[in-house]
């Protein structure tokens, strides 16, 4: 199936004098459903932010998010953070997300830049092997 959408900001890209700490993907449609690539366990969530209401302080900049542990690999545990989601998902810490389930829908909660125009809706994606951040683009295919 692969990834749908366009990468609008790469990991490490300089924005406002600061290196971007994730990969931004513009979805192919509004509130695009994000599907779990495999079974995972929710290790962090944040909800309660409306789309389009800019948050500028602390963790609120992340907007609504789901942080998922996908198990061990030869490089350590695989962790993925899905950020700026639309409100409405109900995952809680400790929940198991089955492979193929909807994690959430893309949105523009938190602090979203409009570098690609429009509302600023996008998925901010961060991926880690253990404590080492890796570039998720290396694992994305069309």
Question: Which stretches of residues belong to each language-model region?
Answer:
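Polar/charged, compositionally biased leader and regulatory segments
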Residues: 1-37
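Generic structural motif
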Residues: 5, 29-44, 48, 97-100
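Glutamine-centric residue-chemistry signal
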Residues: 9, 83, 99-101
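Zn2+-dependent peptidoglycan hydrolase active-site motif and core
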Residues: 20, 36-87, 109-123
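Short alpha-helix capping/helix-loop boundary micro-motifs
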Residues: 26-29, 87-91
